[in-house]
Amino acid sequence: MLIFSVECMNLFPPILQKYIQKNQYSNWLIEPIPNRLYNCIIVIPALAELENVKKLLLSLSENESTYFNDTLILFVVNNTISVSEDIKLNNKLTIEYLNNLTSKYTPITNSISIVTSELQVAFIDASTVGKEMNDKDGGVGLARKIGMDIALNYFDYSSRIKKIFICLDADCTVEKNYITAITEYFQKESCKAAVVNYEHNIYNMNENTAAIICYELFLRYYLLGLQYAGSPYAFHTIGSTIVCDYESYVKIGGMNKLKAAEDFYFLEKLSKITKVHSIKSTCVYPSSRPSFRVPFGTGQRVNRFIAKVRNEYILYNPQSFVILKKWLLLFDSLNKTNLKPILTEVKRISTDLYHFLNENKFEQFWKKICLQDLKDQQIIKQKKFWFDAFKTLKLIHYLRDHGYPVINMFDAIDKLLELFGVNESVKRNEDILQDLDKQKEYLLLLRKLQNN
């Protein structure tokens, strides 16, 4: 592992100069200061994650080392001012561990393979007194933003090789070709943004196993529905799977400061300026634990499942995606067409769709499009911006609440697979809610369909 001690000078491209000036941080810096520049920087927020940081670094150290010298692994150890003393202590120990790991003077027992690897590790202290994030903005979004914004100073802009950000979480592990597969995909493909394949661990039989199988089925079912409908937003939105180049990052104004769903909105903005690819040649393994860290997402869904607050074995009605598909086919075909026949066709598809579009001011949007002197590509762009990932989800929720209620999870999956024309199926019996092996079969089938 290389040791950083000398501050690097860097020449910023014009696209970056204004962004850097606007997003400066006097309170935070990379420690130790890197003595070189990189083509890839992996940014990892860490909140009370000492043991998981060690596991993740061990996992990364077992990667193919081809691109280690060009890759910086950057932890953002963070908390807000008002967190518990236990969290502050864990973060303090995490910073001490990372500081020792990057110091040539302090040997680290039980981390020899990490120390002797060529992994290049650094951290940002957003935890100790005077460096904490404020309670109003502090959270995973701001932690990612701090790391990514500061990391912009340490890309090698003199190199023609693409400069990429990889987003990861401290409670993940990764496949052994993770760094290589992502780096080479971006260098070989015309790619500016991507999501990496993910899989939760479903083989350790504990109280979380049923919860995480159920949650991943929910995630993959929604994605399958979007794929069936032909949505341009058919990609999973998990923070630990996001990759993008620095130019796209800057063009969309960087990472947001949201305490949750920062990944959803970040990817939505990326998808409005470039295609979001799917990297299927490697895999991230997120944690399946309960968590207090964000108000919703994996950890909270596991919490809710274990608490038995509600029936978790339900999914959106497959007919919602049929309506979405018909709407997208109509919407994509529109080109300054008179509004009346459009609305007539919308009503033919679904009166609930008509009411949704009316409530979301589709008529005003379309009249504005028709009044402007726009070329075909500009119209396509405006349509994509208007009916975005969030409005897509709003439509599915609207249909759920207006005539297309949620149904049994496995009935929904069977029906959507049938609509998709998938010949494979899972033979199940009535007690599937008690049969984790059959539930795993469903999940493995969805993984197979989405990873091929």
What are these regions (language model features)?
Residues 58-70, 82, 97, 101:
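Short, acidic, metal-binding catalytic loop of nucleotide-sugar glycosyltransferases
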Residues 87-161:
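Active-site-proximal specificity loops/subdomain of glycosyltransferases
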Residues 223-243:
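A recurrent flexible, glycine/aromatic-enriched loop bordering the glycosyltransferase active site
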Residues 258-265:
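Acidic donor-binding loop at a coil-to-helix junction in glycosyltransferase catalytic cores
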Residues 161-162, 169-184:
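Acidic donor-binding/catalytic loop of UDP-sugar-dependent glycosyltransferases
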Residues 2-11, 304-452:
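Terminal low-complexity segments of carbohydrate-biosynthetic enzymes
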Residues 2-66:
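N-proximal low-complexity "stem/linker" segments adjacent to membrane-targeting elements
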Residues 177-212:
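Conserved donor NDP-sugar-binding/catalytic core segment of glycosyltransferases
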